[in-house]
């Protein structure tokens, strides 16, 4: 199982130009999830092109085949394309099955990002995702973590 990185570690990796084809942004803290998604989109696509090569799906309304098809497309006027699946925890099991082959061999020019408050570790999809994706931990911060986090955020 891949170890999870913090929001700060994600920002450090992105500032060094280190990107992965698969990310799982997981945790109950909505603000941290949204900030991680924003940082990923900006780092992967740049400031002005975030909508042109970015596709957004919602787990409760998405087809696994459609997500894979979209992720397999070539980026236009950019080095990368980004596919975001919000509420990935709500993807039906049959749609998750369609994603398994892609998780084994992701497209190098696409970053697929799954975001959810929590994922069910019993599912094959979640097990495959935790083995192959960069896991970004967006759990609520403990009291001692708030002040350093606020300082770092204010510096940006």
List PLM regions with ranges.
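Conserved beta/loop motifs at nucleotide-recognition and modification sites
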Residues: 1-156
């Amino acid at each position: 199982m891949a170890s999870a990185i913090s929001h700060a570690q994600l920002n450090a990796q992105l500032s060094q130009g280190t990107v992965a084809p698969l990310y799982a942004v997981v945790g109950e803290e909505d603000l941290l999830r949204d900030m991680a998604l924003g940082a990923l989109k900006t780092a992967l696509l740049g400031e002005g092109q975030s909508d042109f090569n970015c596709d957004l799906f919602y787990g409760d309304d998405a087809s696994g085949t459609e997500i894979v098809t979209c992720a397999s497309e070539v980026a236009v006027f950019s080095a990368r394309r980004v596919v975001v699946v919000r509420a990935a925890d709500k993807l039906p099991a049959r749609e998750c099955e369609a994603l398994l082959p892609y998780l084994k061999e992701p497209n190098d020019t696409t970053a697929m990002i799954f975001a959810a408050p929590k994922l069910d570790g019993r599912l094959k999809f979640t097990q495959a995702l935790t083995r192959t994706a960069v896991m970004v931990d967006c759990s609520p911060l403990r009291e001692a973590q708030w002040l350093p986090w606020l300082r770092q955020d204010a510096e940006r």
